[in-house]
Amino acid sequence: MEKQFNVWSVQNDIVCQRQLTINLRRVRNEYDNAVASVAAPSCPPSIPAQTRTCGRKLKLDWFKCTIL
């Protein structure tokens, strides 16, 4: 039982890691876009407008990714 769990959790970690990489790439692109348009107070379209700042939302995304 323990062996199965370990195998599953290793596979799960790999999946999570891959997802994390994809998410971080997306977040980094959005961050770059936000930085590129510093004059515009709004966040990139995919980031909800109700969040206080782009930076805060991106930070939350990072934590969510790392936790998941």
From Swiss-Prot:
Organism: Invertebrate iridescent virus 3
Origin superkingdom: Viruses
UniProt name for this protein: Uncharacterized protein 117L
